[in-house]
């Protein structure tokens, strides 16, 4: 028998509504909303991250930028902070070694050939 208080605190992994394997293909331009989507998709069982390391973001949102009077610098600050986000600030996603692409990310044919070789 479980303790109701402890059972309630344990996160339950969502079921994967997809019958097929989900492969998230990223490069270094995946940031902000892309990382938020990664947070959600990677929580599904059987999801694989492939490609290259993503960018990173912070917990701060709604960023304002103010040029300083000298014109030499600008100050950026967030109005909101996502304090309970599981992924910390400046934490990118890195694919496992066997799913890390080392080729030219601008070469679509090479990406496809590489990914096809992983799926065989």
Regions inferred by a protein language model and the residue ranges of each:
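C-terminal "post-core" interaction segments
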Residues: 1-120
